[in-house]
Amino acid sequence: MNFFMEKNKDAGHRVTIKIPKTTVNNSLFQEFIKIRKTTKINGFRKGKTPIRVIQEKYGSAIYYDIFKKLMQKFFYEFLKTEKIKIIGSPKFYIHQDEDKKKEYFEYSVIYELYPQFQIKDIKQIKVNKINVEITEEDIKKNIETNKNKKNIWNPVNKAVKSYDRVTINYCIYEKNKKIKKFDKDNISFIVSKNTLIPQLNYKIINHFVNDIIFFKIKFHAFHPEKELQNKDITFKIKIIKIEKKQELESEKSNKKNITEKKTIQTDYQTIKNNLHSQINIITDKYLENQIIQKIVEKNILLLPPLLFQKEIKNLYKQYTKQYQEENSNILEKKYHMSLDSEVKKRLYFQIIIEQIILNNKLFADENNIQKLIKKISSNYKNPMEIIKLYNKNKNLKNTMKNIELERQAMLLLKKSIKIEKQNWNFERFLNYNWASHEELMV
């Protein structure tokens, strides 16, 4: 196979490939023979039609299909030979065969390379590892907080304050024209403690029942509701009800008998274990985010536009599917946020981890994968069903393999960098704004 590589200023990378005419003609002939065996043409017995007749009848369509397959075959052989990793879908261009004497056909392919990346000064990176101390008093408070309590919401004739429960009706307008399909009634939420857009929370404060509030927001280009994308939308909100919370201990929690004390003693260790597990997950993620962020700061990592756009589309599909499955509200905050920062985080993590795997020639340890499967399956009612599913499902096997490789790569990174320990008490951990840390990760 002959090929010529070049780099275009605007169009990415290009390779010109030559396919011998004998290869094309042989492939065409084999296809004509297949058609002759399976197709009956008037005037000829099945399997006896002359190749010339089949060529006249089907030649153009078959030639295009054969050449398309050969172009893809030779291009991917070129990628394998040159050990090139591409992103996105390559674009194929057939050259005009002006010189009939040539012994080959020419075509070009434009493609985008997966980013080349070398990690430097890894030993100079410093990050913080948070160790959270949980005292007996912390666990007792947690048990007390989660005891059976009955929340009573009492209607009040007062201005809305934070942590009140508010019920609203709303409708929306674009350029003073109402979009009726998005009308919603009796939407209840706790002010300053919800997943809705911030504008709603601060606009509603200090208002009363029957007050009507207007505010305008620009919907994001990737909002799941296509009809609202990139549009300036005005919300008209009417407050229907304002309620304040009153906590009452249930009758069960008032009966401090011996059985309950035994239950609390049993729950103590379970709650302690659960708290440690949840804290470890959050602090490990915090540590890993710092590592990726520091590597990006010290090393130039350019994300190819094709790769970025591809990941944007994938994330948008996920968000849209989730939005539809959960029958979400258009006021949900996460659907009004830019996808760019989340996509950057994902791609930085993916590229860095893949580079670590490549540099260190890591391979998935089957014993560790089996341990992971057993751990995951233990969370289900029928663990054996999950294990059977894993053994049958190739996609699930690949997912588990990637998780194991990521674990090994991250472990290597943690061993290579400088980690400074920070000791926190449980209260500091609870009060830390973890969401803001995630938002700053770019």
UniProtKB/Swiss-Prot annotation:
Its cellular-component GO annotations read: cytoplasm
One Pfam family recorded for the sequence: Trigger_N
Does Hydrolase appear among the keywords?
A: no
Q: Where in the cell is it found?
A: Cytoplasm
Chief localization? cytoplasm
Question: Residue limits of the PPIase FKBP-type domain?
Answer: 163-248
Family under the similarity heading: Belongs to the FKBP-type PPIase family. Tig subfamily.
Domain free text: Consists of 3 domains; the N-terminus binds the ribosome, the middle domain has PPIase activity, while the C-terminus has intrinsic chaperone activity on its own.
Task performed by this protein = Involved in protein export. Acts as a chaperone by maintaining the newly synthesized protein in an open conformation. Functions as a peptidyl-prolyl cis-trans isomerase.
State the name under which the record lists this protein. Answer: Trigger factor
* UniProt source species: Buchnera aphidicola subsp. Acyrthosiphon pisum (strain Tuc7)
